[in-house]
């Protein structure tokens, strides 16, 4: 945002969907601000919330109180921005990914799309959108680069949360997931296969990067941080690493976008930023 980096489309998965919102509204530092402020609030992300609501992140507090009142999301800026915004969710009945566009975050359906994308299995309630039963998009498609390419976004900036060389191992929670979601065998199968799809996507991403169609931004080092981290020093360290690595890639990003605009004899191809889930 500090360097006026703009793209045609954004797709986010899980926490990437939540962070992507503040990028589209151009509210720099918003996610970091409320994460630090409310990290110990029992309604923000806690066992209290899980026990009392069925969600590790309380729906009312996280998806209404914060964006509507405590640290307002700029709804007008979201609608006014021509950048199209999508989130990735997992369909429990089919096991497949659903890529859903959000056009107005005042619309309860769009709020539920984002909530579904970030609703982790076992510690979240199922979210229903347009008759679909949905959960965290990371299960079915953690890095939705190919979905965006099918939509016509041929040149992509991909933001990963793991350093170079990382590969995901088998799901350690599979037995619990198989029991909890036994009525949804396709979803359980996807949980079982998740690491294979994830690692194959990383392999393909590296090929696209070599071809020049994709620019990858990833952490330059490993920081051992938990998925539900509350320690302020760990959150701050991860944030500062992200800022540092983004600055290191800034000139490459500008050049990548300039080349995109010059493609096809002056007719710009679509450009996009793709964010990976944090899991």
Where are these regions (language model features)?
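Patatin-like phospholipase
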Residues: 1-10, 21-279
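Gly/Ala-rich beta-loop-alpha elbow adjacent to hydrolase catalytic centers
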Residues: 12, 16
């Amino acid at each position: 945002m500090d360097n006026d980096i703009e793209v045609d489309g954004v797709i986010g998965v899980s926490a990437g969907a939540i962070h992507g919102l503040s990028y589209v509204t151009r509210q720099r530092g918003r996610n970091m601000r409320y994460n630090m402020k409310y990290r110990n609030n029992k309604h923000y992300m806690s066992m209290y919330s899980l026990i009392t609501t069925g969600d590790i992140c309380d729906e009312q507090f996280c998806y209404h109180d914060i964006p509507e009142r405590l640290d307002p999301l700029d709804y007008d800026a979201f609608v006014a921005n021509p950048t199209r915004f999508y989130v990735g969710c997992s369909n429990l009945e089919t096991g497949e990914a659903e890529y859903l566009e959000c056009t107005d975050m005042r619309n309860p359906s769009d709020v539920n799309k984002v909530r579904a994308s970030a609703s982790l299995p076992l510690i979240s309630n199922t979210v229903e959108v347009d008759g679909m039963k949905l959960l965290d998009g990371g299960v079915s498609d953690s890095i939705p680069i190919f979905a965006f390419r099918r939509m016509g976004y041929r040149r992509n900036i991909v933001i990963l949360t793991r350093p170079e060389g990382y590969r995901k191992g088998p799901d350690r929670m599979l037995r619990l997931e198989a029991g909890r979601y036994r009525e949804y065998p396709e979803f359980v199968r996807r949980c079982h296969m998740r690491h294979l799809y994830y690692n194959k996507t990383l392999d393909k991403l590296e090929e696209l990067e070599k071809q020049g169609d994709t620019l990858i931004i990833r952490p330059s080092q490993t920081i051992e941080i938990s998925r539900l981290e509350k320690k302020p020093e760990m959150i701050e360290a991860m944030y500062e690493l992200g800022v540092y690595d983004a600055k290191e890639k800034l000139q490459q990003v500008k050049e990548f976008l300039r080349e995109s605009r010059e493609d096809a004899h002056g007719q710009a191809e679509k450009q996009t930023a793709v964010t990976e889930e944090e899991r």
